[in-house]
Amino acid sequence: MIEEIARVCMSSSLIPSVNKLGSLPVQIAGSEELKQKYLTRLAKGEGGFSYCLSEPEAGSDAANQKTRAVRDGDDWVLNGVKRWITNAGVSEYYTVIAVTDPEQRTRGMSAFVVEKSDEGVSFGAPEKKLGIKGSPTCEVYLDNVRIPGDRIIGAEGEGFEIAMKTLDHTRITIAAQAVGVAQGALDYALGYAKEREQFGRPIADNQGLQFLLADMGMKVEAARQLTYAAAGRSERGDKDLTFFGASAKCFASDVAMQVTTDAVQVLGGYGYTRDYPVERMMRDAKITQIYEGTNQIQRVVMSRALLK
């Protein structure tokens, strides 16, 4: 589904994908009470989920969390700032990673469900982005946000592990987005090449362009097959999921950036204008190389998985 939506509009594909990202920690490690409460509401369309991991000083270095959660009786009190949060201000629920024991680094983080209506939750202005402009991205501010103790996801200290397990699965969603936007750009480029005439014949008759289109199609299908292979491992919970999730995301997003750029080239000057959709596809594709871990970080993840 993500692939097919992204084939037309990547911003729209973020609606289901971010809800998967935000709710998956509850599915993976939440108590039965949390699952019944929040996943039921999500399934009924009563509120969406966002995922709050990134911070101003914790991008690729996700372990460098500054948001704190402190016990106060039976409650937790959260303070901090989360950055680059998709659907911030729109979603009703937020999976928040916060430090509960600063001495333990990654083993001192925990995951919580924070509700939009909780006192002390506020949001920044929408970011002015290169692409995916139809999807809001904002900061989330937590100012003495008090939540009941039963909103912790999993056990105290398991937050970082839960966050990383979540990304193993959801990076495949990003790969699917990348395949979709690449396929959409290829579709448009093919149609244009058959209709656009220069030198008295369709530009698709030019062998140089044929080779470009062939490479685009080959790369898209290779990315699709790797993404589907990774998706199968996600469903089965295979041991090599970490490698396949990272490799699918990395390869498919690199393909998406190349194919959408090539699609602009096929359309020439027209591709550079907003009268045609490929310039938007090219701008949208860029984020797939960045979010849920840059492709440089994906290569670190893959190498560690191989050398383990």
Functional labels for PLM-detected ranges:
Residues 1-13, 29-34, 45, 61, ...:
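Alpha-helical interface subdomain recognition
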Residues 45-53:
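A short, Trp-centered hydrophobic/proline-enriched beta-strand micro-motif
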Residues 50, 66-68, 75, 93-97, ...:
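Conserved hydrophobic/aromatic beta-strand scaffold that supports enzyme active sites
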Residues 20-29:
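Helix-loop "lid/cap" segments that line or gate small-molecule binding pockets
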Residues 2-6, 98, 114-119, 143-146:
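Short Ser/Thr-interspersed hydrophobic loop/turn segments at strand-loop and sheet-helix junctions
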Residues 64, 117-148:
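Flexible, small-/acidic-enriched active-site or ligand-binding loops
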Residues 79-123:
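A short core secondary-structure module
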Residues 57-60, 84-87, 101-103, 129-136:
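Short Gly/Pro-enriched turn/cap motifs at secondary-structure boundaries
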